[in-house]
């Protein structure tokens, strides 16, 4: 049990309007130390796994409270009789009591006013947590501890608004052990018998574009890549990604793309005004009243893939660069910056002069996890971001094809490794 208090890393008007809010709460956990009876326990240095329950007070009545339920893992950094330091990684769903649709004022015109909660747009959000966990044993059954870390909460544009929470925190508490006498004979396992593996994943989800727009737009992706397992818990490689985002559209109130307004001209006072008379946009050639094509809503990129294996669960962290990105020429701010001119298409690599939250970057991150459910079949959930701004959350199904290392293939087996309950005995 760890009571905590923290401070927000977020800035800007969405937080300044609440003035002096600080998060606080209580982290509870039920932990299962390593029994040294499974391969993944050995590979991760006998890590501890647990289930956590957190209660959060966001520090202002407009922001309300939250309850998060999540699995977590503690990776040993220092493990002695008198002191333990472990790295914590956690993630799961969280429910908030206050959001845009629970408040009395739901007028989008008051978006920046202190009368509205623009931090959350729905009840269920994703909760991510990482930090350092410290323990000092006092007796065989009791230890004093502390935890210092970071947590994030948002809905990944499944709902709007989606400013979300980013905070650091510190805590002090106690850990009680109930089975300190239970010991099992450690089992030694061989290394994973495969090196290269091919991943093929299809995923889909929905994105909301703007508060005043009730529609959700289809998003989907296809990934194919190959990774090499450097050791028993880490693999890296390259992958090809193709994304479709139905939210790249003129049929929404979101002002990220040029929408129904095409040309910008200077009026008699030298001010930039929207010109709604022209049929074709002089910047990108788009026709008024005709939505963007399927090709314009599609992106493709080449990504560096990183995988961190925790038994059946694998954490994913990808960084990619687009080599096909028609949407780079469709942004509202890009049209406004080039008012009254015919400009060449942007290069694939370009700066985002209006910062994060404006034009989306020419590169992307993807953070998530996949869980093996049968043989090499897995389910996956990931969040795709441009810089630190989420584009969407997706859910998918995939298959991994691991290839035996030279000299590791059992006689009579194919070149492809297939999981079994006790594969190390084969």
Tell where the protein language model's regions lie, with residue ranges.
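Outer-membrane beta-barrel translocator domains and adjoining extracellular loop/strand segments
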Residues: 11-16, 62-66, 99-106, 156-163, ...
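Glycine- and aromatic-enriched membrane insertion/assembly motifs of diderm outer-membrane
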Residues: 18-60, 214-309, 313-314
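Outer-membrane beta-barrel "beta-signal"
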Residues: 28, 166-185, 390-426
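Residues on the lipid-exposed face of transmembrane beta-strands in outer-membrane beta-barrel proteins
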Residues: 26-32, 71-77, 89-93, 128-136, ...
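Repeated loop/turn-to-beta-strand initiation elements of outer-membrane beta-barrel proteins
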Residues: 37-39, 81-85, 136-144, 180-183, ...
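Residues that define the transmembrane beta-barrel architecture of outer-membrane proteins
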Residues: 20-26, 45, 63-69, 83, ...
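Transmembrane beta-strands of outer-membrane beta-barrel proteins
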Residues: 1, 47-51, 69, 85-91, ...
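Transmembrane beta-strands of outer-membrane beta-barrel pores
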Residues: 3-9, 32-34, 53-59, 91-99, ...
């Amino acid at each position: 049990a760890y009571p905590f208090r923290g401070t927000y890393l977020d800035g800007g008007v969405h937080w300044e309007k609440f003035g002096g809010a600080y998060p606080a709460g209580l982290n509870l956990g039920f932990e299962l130390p390593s029994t040294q009876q499974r391969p993944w326990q050995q590979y991760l240095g006998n890590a501890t796994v647990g289930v956590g329950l957190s209660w959060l007070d966001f520090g202002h009545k407009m922001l309300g409270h939250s309850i998060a339920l999540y699995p977590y893992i503690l990776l040993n950094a220092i493990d002695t009789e008198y002191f333990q330091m472990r790295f914590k990684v956690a993630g799961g769903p969280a429910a908030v009591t206050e959001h845009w649709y629970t408040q009395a004022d739901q007028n989008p015109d008051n978006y920046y006013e202190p009368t509205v909660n623009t931090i959350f747009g729905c009840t269920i959000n994703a909760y991510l947590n990482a930090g350092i966990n410290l323990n000092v044993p006092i007796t065989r059954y009791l230890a004093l501890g502390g935890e210092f870390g970071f947590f994030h909460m948002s809905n990944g544009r499944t709902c709007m608004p989606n400013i979300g929470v980013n905070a650091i925190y510190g805590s002090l508490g106690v850990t009680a052990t109930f089975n300190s006498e239970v010991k099992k004979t450690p089992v030694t396992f061989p290394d994973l018998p495969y090196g290269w593996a091919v991943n093929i994943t299809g995923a889909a989800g929905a994105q909301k574009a703007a508060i005043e727009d009730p529609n959700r737009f289809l998003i989907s992706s296809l990934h194919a890549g190959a990774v090499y397992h450097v050791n028993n818990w880490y693999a890296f490689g390259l992958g090809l990604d193709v994304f479709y985002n139905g939210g790249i559209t003129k049929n929404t109130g979101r002002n990220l793309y040029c929408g129904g307004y095409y040309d910008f001209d200077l009026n008699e006072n030298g001010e930039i005004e929207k010109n709604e008379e022209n049929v074709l946009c002089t910047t990108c050639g788009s026709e008024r009243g005709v939505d963007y094509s399927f090709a314009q809503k599609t992106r493709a990129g080449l990504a560096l893939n990183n995988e961190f294996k925790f038994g059946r669960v694998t954490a994913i962290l990808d960084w990619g660069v687009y080599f096909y990105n028609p949407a780079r020429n469709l942004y509202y701010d890009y049209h406004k910056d080039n008012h009254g001119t015919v400009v060449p298409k942007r290069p694939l690599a370009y700066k985002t002069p209006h910062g994060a939250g404006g034009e989306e970057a020419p590169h992307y991150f993807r953070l998530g996890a996949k869980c093996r459910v049968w043989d090499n079949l897995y389910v996956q959930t990931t969040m795709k971001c441009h810089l630190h701004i989420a584009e969407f959350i997706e859910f998918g199904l995939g298959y991994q094809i691991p290839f035996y290392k030279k000299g590791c293939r059992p006689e009579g087996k194919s070149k492809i490794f297939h999981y079994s309950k006790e594969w190390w005995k084969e």
